[in-house]
Each structure stands twice: as structure tokens, then as C-alpha cells.
Amino acid sequence: MKRILLTLLTSLFVATASADEGMWLPSLIGGRIDDMRSKGFRLTAEDIYSVNKASMKDAVVLFNGGCTGEIVSSEGLLLTNHHCGYGAIQSHSSVEHDYLTHGFWARSRAEELPNKNLFVRILVRMEEVTDRIAAGEKPEELIRAAESEGTGYKASVEQMYYGNQQFLFVYEQFDDVRLVGAPPSSIGKFGGDTDNWIWPRHTGDFSVFRIYASPDNKPAAYSPDNVPYRPRRHFTVSTRGVKEGDFTMIYGFPGNTQEYILSDAVDYVVNRADPDKIAIRTGRLDLISAAQATDPALRIHYAAKHANIANAWKKWQGEQLGLTRTRNVAVKRDYERRFQAWADARPEYTGLLPMMKAEYARMLEPYYAYEITRETLGTLPIRYSDEERSADSFERCRPTEQALFRYAFAAYAERCPEAYRVPEFLDGVAAAGSTDAYADKVFEGLWHRTDTMAVARLDKAMKRMLGHISWMLGTTSLRNPTSKRLNELYTLYIKGLREWDTQRAFYPDANLTLRVAYGTVAGYEYADGEYHTPQTTLDGIIAKDNPEIYDYDIPQALRDLYASKDYGRWGVTIDGQRTVPVC
């Protein structure tokens, strides 16, 4: 059966799988290669990652600091998710040229659209530096030395296993990345927030960009003289397709996982943090959605903001559901009990878990206060930029922005534990008479502020409050859900787990560094008697199509195509019916 497969290395996490798990470091993938071959992999470890020759790593990019992309041509053509390119698409959209709604396709290189502050990074190499740092070398020195090796080089030192290992990552950064194409939102965001993070899915979640470089193929700032980047390696697009049982692999930059955290932390996430953060974001989304429904200019203005808020909002809902359904807290507590039984006979680990749990009891309340502050007051602008002020929609935004200020102040006052509220906030509310009145006062000061006026319209208490919040949200000890002491204990805990649980295949948590995941293509059983196949088709889109609901209103051309069944070489026959694969 024919399948359409854009690339197995896409950042879309389609329904793969067997019971395989893991996000493996590519430089160490040789240790997994036998298992990969047993599942159908036919290449070598060097085909995946190599410093000395072109390999797959040279075609996988970190897109704009938070997404994965893949190079699919010898002239720098790049695929990434639609939602990853959403901000760039929005930046070029207007009521007259509504690329968000109608899509965009450059018909020549001259029509490709440059994007301010958009960049991609390609991994040059990664190397373990644990011993070098233990011997006294400083991470900053390693970074400086690596960045001096080439044009546009960027580097970082990242911890694995809570500091048991440390790796240096060296990237080549390209800052001239141009928009080539994107489908209409009715394709690229089909299903909207309802279908996000779930399977089955019918979303054409892709956008197309091109990397440009200097004539000598080096990173360069935007210039009309730049030329398409010539990659060391690019992926070809296969139209042969896949079937259940085939080997499949994901190569990309997963954001963050916490595989080894204690049951106390999971309990906090499931029963306290996620419910409150979901509720707060629901209120913000309701305000923004109401504004978008009244004005096409506001719909475009708030499109990326709405999408950014909704992405984690929907993820947390699934996280809460999944962790509850799998009884993750109870499972972890049983695992910890068995570890403790082993640790009791080993002085190095005997009191480890009790100390970790005591540290959690000490720091979870202030961390909760930090999370609430970040989700409320931390979402508000410290200033409106000149670029925002010059936008046609700026004055149109005023009622919505003021409503968001009021909502943030009220949610903060309601949910942040009193002992951790910013003192200047309490003083300001008391002086103004209510949270709404104080929110209005702060909003008016920020709304009218310009570069020349600076903060002249903000009284001292308001400036202190904003400064305090900026400090709080920028403090590493508060941002990190593990205190310095707890992080040290986790370092020992992971060491102990690896000594005790010798049958477990350990892999480092995701931290936005390049990883490999692999398995075999399969569907899954969502509930008793409810099996979802790993492939969706156009029939599913038509079944969901509803012109009355924005997220499910497909283009008329797609309805016409379905009616005619004129699918050309992309058509397949499933159960005697002609259709076309989607995801």
C-alpha cells in the first residue's frame, strides 16, 4: 500500500510504535545500533552521526531555538512544522495579504520573504567534556574556544543525568532564513487546539523555508547578495511510504523531559501545577479569542500569541490525563520503595530519598509561587516596543491588552500564596483600592510610555513592582524546579539508579539537544476496543469538516478534490475506497 511520507525525521511526532523508548545522544548511537538493526535499520552509526564525513546530523536543524527542521534539497530548502513557522507567517500577514488564512507560496527566489531574528543552527559536533571540567576547565572557556573555530559558531555545555556527564555542543548558526511557503491555516492548523497533541490527527502541520549563506557558503546576516545554502547532506523525500512493522526513526531537538523525577514532583504537577496553569491560560485564551472574533486585524495580531499560549495549555491537559491514567505517581512510589530497600544496605545511598523528599517539601511552595507569577504577571509586557506602537492594530489592541492586565492581576492575587506575593503589588493594590484599579494604573503607564518618556508616568512603587517581578522571573534558583541542593541529590540518585537497576536502558532527559528515537510503525489502543491505526486519510478530514467551526472549515478546493477522487499518483485504495494519506 502506497503512503505519502514527507520525512521520517520530521518534528511531527506521529503515532509510532512499539514499547521502545529513549532519546539517545547521536554520538553514542553505536551502542544501540544492533537493536536498531533488529528492527529493520539498514545503515550504520556513522550514517546517523559523524564528524569526519557528511551524515544525517548535517540535515537536521534547530529551528529558531525551539523547533526541529530538516533540509530537503541541495539548495537549503527546509521543512519544519506549521506552528514553528507561524510567527514568521504572521509577521508578513495583514488584512490585505492574509497569509495565515490563505497560505503563501513564493513562485521564485525573489518572492521568498526574509525574517527578522529568525535563525537555524546545525550541529557541527558534540563531545563529552566531563573529565575536562572535573580537571578544572571552565565551561565558559570551552564555549569561547569552540566559538572561535568558525564563522557563526555557537556553543553550549549541557548537563546529562543531572551532571553525571557533561557535553559540549558546537553549532553553525545561519541568520538569513526566508519563508518559501505555508499552507492555509485550514490545512496547517486543521483541528486547532482540539486536535493538538493527540492522535489520530489530520493536520498539514508544515511550513517551508530556505537557508541563505554568503557566496562562500558561510553564515551571514541578511543580504540580497546571499545565495541558497549548500548543505553537506540533505534528505530526499520518499513516496514509497511505510506500513505497520516498518522501522522508523525520529531525529531532532526534543525540548524537555523529566524521566527520573520523584513521585513527589509528579504529584505536584498532576494535582496542583497543571490544573492551576490550565485554568489561568483558559482565561487568557478566552479574552484573546473574543477579541479575534471581532476584528480581522486583531485575529492576525494575536494569532501567534494565541497559538503559543494554547500549545502548552493543551499539552498540560494531556499530561495530566496521561499521568493519571497510567497511575504514574503510584508506580514511581513503588519504584522508589524498591530502590530504598537496595539503598538501605549501602551507606552512600541510605538516607538519599528521605533527604530528597524533605527538600521537595521545602521548595515546592516557593516554586509554585514562581510558576503562578510567571503565568500571570510574568506574561505582561514591561514595555511596548516602538515596533508594536507603529502597528496599525496598536490602538485596536487597547481594550484587549487592558483586559489581559486586569485578568493577570486578579489571577495573581487569587492564586499566588500570600507569603510569596510581591510586596510592591500588595502596596499598589492597597493604595489603588482594588486589583482592577491597580491594573489600570500600571497599564496606563506602560501603554503611553515611549523611549523619550521612558518610565516618567510610572510612579516609584510601580517601577519597583515591575523590577521585582523581572528579578524574580530571571532568578535561576526560582526558574529551576530543583534547588541547588536537590540537584546535587539527583546527581547521586541517578548514579544509584544506574548501579541498582542494571536491566534498565537509561538515557538522558531531553534538553533541546540533538537526539535519536526509533522503533517500529504501529497504531495503539486508546481505550478498550478503540484501536487507532498509524495512518490517517482525507476521509477523516471530510468527516471532521464543518464550515461553521473555524478550526474545521477546510478549503472548498479540498472538498471538490474529495468529490472528484482525482488524486493522481497520490491516491491509494483502502478497503476498496480511493483516498489519499494525510498523516
Predicted regions and their residues:
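Terminal presequence/propeptide segments associated with secretion/organelle targeting
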Residues: 2-4, 8, 15-583
